[in-house]
């Protein structure tokens, strides 16, 4: 394990108020890993610090650093934590050359404040990924590795260059660790370092529901409490037939149609409920405002 690589990995602890919208789903205390991308900036998976009132960053030396702010990007699933002072040892971020199936990789993570663990393997897939929480990537990295610790740590190539952030363990569905390409962070780096949100024109419509692709179509497996879909009356078990009359097949097409709209726009969802088609008018929300 290269020393610089292991020294760049930090432990994160986040405290979330019980009143925050993410608390019932993700919990009020979360732990994760992150990677230093500069002396004072730590990159991690965004759900670890989503809604956090307090975040602690602990380096490999066991010392806790004070956090100035966190900046989230819902589209990529990444977050940048900014420290009050910078003494971390950053890792090398190099998106090029891009990883390909078969390339050797390794990940580093934490199991506690001082404990670091790693795993090595190979890339199995680089390509589109869709998830049921209104999240989609055009390019995700799948590997053969099972994450031996907490989410949010870095994925390295054989030359110890950061290529991604390990977000999820997907062993239950036949895939192993999923990583978000570091290029997605570099595209947003300046904004995240400034703690800025995307402009209103850049924000996507958000409905607050959990669609699942099935043999029968796109089924609603649940709704976010207090979210736009719940307010509109969308129900678990509904089958999505179309959006404003446009037929949708699969999560990718569904999300692309939704994301053509912005927050505040009305979207008519035609759903099959029981044996009848119903139209549910959903006033699209702003994920940044809902989860602020």
Task: Map each language-model feature to its residues.
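Conserved active-site neighborhood of the chymotrypsin/trypsin-like protease fold
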Residues: 17-19, 31, 36-117, 139-140, ...
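Active-site region of chymotrypsin-like
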Residues: 8, 20, 84-90, 117-175, ...
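PDZ-domain C-terminal substructure recognizer with occasional recognition of PDZ-binding tails
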Residues: 193-197, 201, 219, 230-235, ...
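Terminal peptide-recognition signature
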Residues: 10-12, 34, 40, 44, ...
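Flexible, gly/ser-rich surface segments that form the specificity/activation loops bordering the active-site cleft
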Residues: 27, 91-136, 171-177, 189-202
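A short glycine-leucine-enriched loop at secondary-structure breakpoints
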Residues: 94-98, 154, 159, 222, ...
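A short, Trp-centered hydrophobic/proline-enriched beta-strand micro-motif
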Residues: 4-25, 107
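C-terminal cap/linker of serine protease catalytic domains
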Residues: 1-2, 158, 162-215, 256, ...
